[in-house]
């Protein structure tokens, strides 16, 4: 059972930070295009990266192109599409590709099927596909059955469940493998990994971080193998503030003991 996260890592410690985006750094919206990461949060991430030799990466189901757009004007190491594409600290990209015929056939099948499922949405990511049903939860079972059919017919693909989404991605790619790859490279190598995420897609990352003796943090409710928990996206934002400004947080704790309003509720 994950414990509430009440102690922030010391800014001077030897950590490598990994953050999911949707539901972790940004509030989930009805449509992915509506999601925004507040500029202040991006500044905190950039500051945290600077204090850790650049050892901070975004790990997401989104494409790297989307992640860069959401992180502007900052540029971080990234793992997109659950690790199917990755960019290291030097800007070198590592991309898992599928045969063009497979991508074409799968996309055609998905598009033709979703026509009969109003309210659902297909997001094509090149080497992966996301079947969204946030606006049509009654079609969850149908999308799951469709994804299972696809992964059975094309064994190089695997199914990944998420919040109001069923994803089809290259087999063997997940956020845990992406984090493990970063941890083999400078500036991440030799550091203690910290991973913050909110979804089923983040569980593989929690497993890798736990095995490495790091800090795994689940955002929100639900069963998890993460060791720690933050209740909401605003709690993640406050936690980032605490990490970046530990002296300010100490003053907050002193004020709390003196009976003043606390900076934030216990997280």
Swiss-Prot record:
As cofactor, the record names:
Mg(2+)
Q: Name one GO molecular function term.
A: magnesium ion binding
What is an annotated GO biological process for this record, any one? trehalose biosynthetic process
Provide the binding site for Mg(2+). Answer: 20, 22, 198
UniProtKB keywords: Hydrolase, Magnesium, Metal-binding
* Top-rank EC class of the record's enzyme: hydrolase
Which pathway does this chain act in?
A: Glycan biosynthesis; trehalose biosynthesis
Q: Which reaction does it catalyse?
A: alpha,alpha-trehalose 6-phosphate + H2O = alpha,alpha-trehalose + phosphate
Q: Does the keyword RNA-binding apply?
A: no
Which domain of life does the UniProt lineage start with?
Bacteria
Quote the record's binding site residues for substrate.
Answer: 20-22
EC number(s) reported in the record = 3.1.3.12
Question: Active-site residues?
Answer: 20
Question: What role does this protein play?
Answer: Removes the phosphate from trehalose 6-phosphate to produce free trehalose.
Record's family?
A: Belongs to the trehalose phosphatase family.
What PANTHER family has UniProt attached to this entry? TREHALOSE 6-PHOSPHATE PHOSPHATASE
Q: What is this protein called?
A: Trehalose-phosphate phosphatase
């Amino acid at each position: 059972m994950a414990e509430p996260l009440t102690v922030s890592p010391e800014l001077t410690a030897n950590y490598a930070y990994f953050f999911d985006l949707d539901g972790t750094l940004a509030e989930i919206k009805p449509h992915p295009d509506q999601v925004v990461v507040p500029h202040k949060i991006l500044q905190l991430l950039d500051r945290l990266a600077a204090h850790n030799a650049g050892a901070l990466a975004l790990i997401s189901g989104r494409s790297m192109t989307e992640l860069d757009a959401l992180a502007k004007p900052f540029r971080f190491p990234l793992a997109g599409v659950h690790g199917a594409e990755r960019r290291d600290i030097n800007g070198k990209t590592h991309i898992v590709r599928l045969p063009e015929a497979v991508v074409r056939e799968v996309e055609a099948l998905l598009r033709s099927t979703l026509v009969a499922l109003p309210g659902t949405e297909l997001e094509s990511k090149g080497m992966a596909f996301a079947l969204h049903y946030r606006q049509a939860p009654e079609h969850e079972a149908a999308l799951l059955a469709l994804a299972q059919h696809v992964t059975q017919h094309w064994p190089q693909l695997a199914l990944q469940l998420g919040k109001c989404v069923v994803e089809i991605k290259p087999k063997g790619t997940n956020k845990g493998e992406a984090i493990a790859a970063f941890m083999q490279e400078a500036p991440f190598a030799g550091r203690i990994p910290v991973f913050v995420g909110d979804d089923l897609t983040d569980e593989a990352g929690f497993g890798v971080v736990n095995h490495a003796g790091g800090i795994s943090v689940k955002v929100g409710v639900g069963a998890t193998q993460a060791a720690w928990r933050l209740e909401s996206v605003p709690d993640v934002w406050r936690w980032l503030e605490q990490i970046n400004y530990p002296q300010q947080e100490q003053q907050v704790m002193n004020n709390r003991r003196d009976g003043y309003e606390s900076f934030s509720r216990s997280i």
